[in-house]
Structure formats: C-alpha cells, structure tokens
Amino acid sequence: MNIKISEITKELELVGEGGFFGVKDKYGTDEREGVKKLLFKYENRYEKLNAERARVRFLQEYELSYPDYRYICGIDEVGRGPLAGPVIACAVILPKDCEILYINDSKQLSEKKREALYDEIMEKAISVGIGSASHARIEEINILQATYEAMRGAINKLGVVPELLLNDAVTIPKVVIPQVPIIKGDAKSISIAAASIVAKVTRDRLMVEYDTVFPGYGFASNKGYGSADHIKALKELGPSPIHRASFIKNLTSC
C-alpha cells in the first residue's frame, strides 16, 4: 500500500534540507504524479536557497578580503534627493561569518522585506550607528556636506571603533579610519547593503511620523520625494517646516 502524499510531506518537513535527498531516494521510484510534483517542489526550493546562499557569499567578499580586520563597517545614506526631511546615514558592523539571506540594496527590496531584514540586521550586527542631518542643516551647508556630516555621526554612534570603512561610492572627509569607496557598494557588500536597509527603514518611519504632524503632503507614501501629488500639495499648501527651501525654489514662490 502506497504511503499517503500528506505523510511524505510531513516527512519532508521533519527532515528539512539536510535530509531531503534521503527522502528523495526513498520515494524517487514512486510513479504517482503527486509524489513527483512534491519532490520537485522541495528540490527546487532547496536549489533556490543554495543559490541565494551563494549570492550572499559573493556579497561577503569585500569583508572577507581583509582578514586582518575584525571590525569592518559598511556605510550608506538615504535622503539626498527628497524635497523634505533629513538625510539619514547608517554605519553597520557585521560578524565576518554573518549570513543574512535576501539582503540587497534597499532600493531593490519591497517595504515588507526591508522591515524584516531590518529586524534581522539589528539582531545580528555587532554594532549599528545612525546619523542624520536635518533639512535646516542641509540648507546651511549643502546636501553633500550634510551627507558627510550624517555619515560621521553614524560612525561616532557605533559601540565599537571600526578598523575599516566600506563606503557606498564616497570618501568621507575628516575621518581618520581607512576607507574603501565602492561604486554601487550597496549591491556588492553585505555591510553596505545592511547600512542601506537600516538607513532607509529609519528614514521612512520618520517620514510616516512627519505625515501626522504635517498632513496634506503625503509624506507617509512619498517619503518627501517629489511625486506628482507631493508637488501639487506643495503648490496648494506652500512649504511645510521640514521642506528644503533650495530644493523647492522652482516649485513655489514661498
């Protein structure tokens, strides 16, 4: 008598990835279409999982290429382009053997995935530092210098002193720690990718809060970026206290 497919499913769940091929060998000669589909589904799942692990190992190559350094810090920012709100920078130090599946440049991830990864990063990281520069500070010293200031602030808030900085494309002035700028680093380094996610989630949450304080501009959805609805509201309502004057000077006469 053939074992029920539901029982095979339970067995597959019980043994997990490590025992899959044993179960596959056990039922590989079963001619039932349902069994074939079940085994294919699980094998495909584990193949995708292994491919993801390989992708994450590739993201670890920069960190692993500096074996003499224990504390390697990835740095990234978010918020250089919006019409309103601060620029936020994040510095993240991960353990050398840290595996965070599905981590990527924050721009490539859904909000739901970013939120889940944020929690995992905060749990696994050796240290996380977050820095910011307000809309007023951006106006005072310009967006580039404000970004550098936010990055320095993030470094200073780390619980340990990093030995090496991996930066997304930039070299940060007034920092004595060795730096390695990496073009499109948030897609090439696990530490920078982690920093991009934490910075993005932090700023997005802040803009959602601002939406309740300054309603009408749609900050909860546009996060301060220049969407059509945001620009329309800006023209109708005038600027809020967190708008960047130099960024909106061509959009409003206020």
Swiss-Prot record:
Any one Gene Ontology BP term: DNA replication, removal of RNA primer
Keywords for the protein's UniProt record, in alphabetical order: Cytoplasm, Endonuclease, Hydrolase, Manganese, Metal-binding, Nuclease
Entry keyword annotation includes Cell inner membrane: no
Gene Ontology molecular functions: manganese ion binding; RNA binding; RNA-DNA hybrid ribonuclease activity
Swiss-Prot/TrEMBL catalytic activity: Endonucleolytic cleavage to 5'-phosphomonoester
Cofactor(s) for this UniProt protein: Mn(2+); Mg(2+)
InterPro entries reported in the protein's UniProt record: RNase_HII, RNase_HII/HIII, RNase_HII/HIII_dom, RNaseH-like_sf, RNaseH_sf
Compartments, as annotated in UniProt: Cytoplasm
Family: Belongs to the RNase HII family.
The protein's role, per its UniProt record: Endonuclease that specifically degrades the RNA of RNA-DNA hybrids.
Record-given protein name: Ribonuclease HII
Organism: Lachnoclostridium phytofermentans (strain ATCC 700394 / DSM 18823 / ISDg) (Clostridium phytofermentans)
Organismal lineage: Bacteria, Bacillati, Bacillota, Clostridia, Lachnospirales
